[in-house]
């Protein structure tokens, strides 16, 4: 019994390195797509007629450059209108009181008025 067991051990030990050195290549099953193959075959077999300039004549509009823009018309055109504009009186919201001599006196007003806040002891 021992001689048979020892033979098996020796046989397995001698085959073991060969099993490790074997390299198995696995391949996947090749799947064919029949519809895709038919489509690609039809694409390869299709011959299109080359397009010419006469084909595009009915489908494309000819290019025309845009028109140059006109100058806008302004209300104040000409030197007379400019002179009339400069001679106009300036309208202001503040009407100055005229003094007895006929000259208007400038009135000085405070343009920045700050209200003094009352400080209370509670706020400190």
Swiss-Prot record:
Belongs to the ATPase h subunit family. GO terms for biological process: cristae formation; mitochondrial proton-transporting ATP synthase complex assembly; proton motive force-driven ATP synthesis; proton transmembrane transport. It comes from the Eukaryota. Present with 6140 molecules/cell in log phase SD medium. Keywords: ATP synthesis, CF(0), Hydrogen ion transport, Ion transport, Membrane, Mitochondrion, Mitochondrion inner membrane, Transit peptide, Transport. Residues 1-32 form a transit peptide. F-type ATPases have 2 components, CF(1) - the catalytic core - and CF(0) - the membrane proton channel. In yeast, the dimeric form of ATP synthase consists of 17 polypeptides: alpha, beta, gamma, delta, epsilon, 4 (B), 5 (OSCP), 6 (A), 8, 9 (C), d, E (Tim11), f, g, h, i/j and k. The keyword Cytoplasm does not apply. It comes from Saccharomyces cerevisiae (strain ATCC 204508 / S288c). One of its GO terms (cellular component) is proton-transporting ATP synthase complex. Residues 100-124 have a biased composition (Acidic residues). It is found in: Mitochondrion; Mitochondrion inner membrane. PANTHER family: ATP SYNTHASE SUBUNIT H, MITOCHONDRIAL. Residues 89-124 are annotated as: Disordered. The gene is ATP14. Mitochondrial membrane ATP synthase (F(1)F(0) ATP synthase or Complex V) produces ATP from ADP in the presence of a proton gradient across the membrane which is generated by electron transport complexes of the respiratory chain. F-type ATPases consist of two structural domains, F(1) - containing the extramembraneous catalytic core and F(0) - containing the membrane proton channel, linked together by a central stalk and a peripheral stalk. During catalysis, ATP synthesis in the catalytic domain of F(1) is coupled via a rotary mechanism of the central stalk subunits to proton translocation. Its main location: mitochondrion. This is ATP synthase subunit H, mitochondrial. It holds the Pfam family ATP_sub_h.
